[in-house]
């Protein structure tokens, strides 16, 4: 039985002038790496974009995507009302969540709570049951309902409940903060807005402002612990989800200031590996920042990634069990394939690896 199986996704993607992920001052997020300032897009921002893509691009069924919200009471109330219209759904929903150990009041739960559609239905079904005699057993049943049947995105990204760690789910996927492969200096766009109803003899602007932005070639990385995913979802579903995760990670993008910059791009190159030892982030390829040249940043970044991976496999890490690339420039690591073909082959490869190796 294989105890370890990981799928690593490495993406190089060039983004034009943009501000897709801002800090508290409105500036594009940055990080110091290799002694220089890099553009940065947070892990949270890209995971949110991926969860949206799961639904908007029909990569997962809606039932497979959970809700992260403080309005859990309302979700359970709605389900109770559908099951038992004659009962006081609002009162029953609050009581049910209290018994389940989820603190809530008229404003909702104290903190955001990640819950699946199946868990909502299970809580509602228990709430309308008329044969409740053992209150302790009932509360345990409510807790069990919240521990079973996670949505796909809960299985992927995990759930943390500070008030009750027994409801936590360990994430099967990790998504790194994306950083530019080169040094970046933020710039400012000074803009004016015209008042369409301004008098003709007043030529001044109706509004003045600035917006901060940068452009970058980003290195993006994510990994999926396939055995952990299989433990929650089963072998066949896990393989399908790895494919959906890969497509969402590769094609999605956070939406910050997108109407201002129209910065939606697709990757320049993708490198995917199946590993049986550990996940391997290849950001070390860019610890020495790629220098500006007439070639731009994308092509030198591909060369740096390819050379670093080859060197790493010769010294510290075993070569991947299987490798795939999309786009040009990384063919020395694996033959290039169209994206959809690569994802299909990846799904089949994961299925093959899981056959006979299911977690019991």
Residue ranges of predicted features:
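Basic polyanion-binding and macromolecular-assembly surfaces
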Residues: 1-40, 44-360
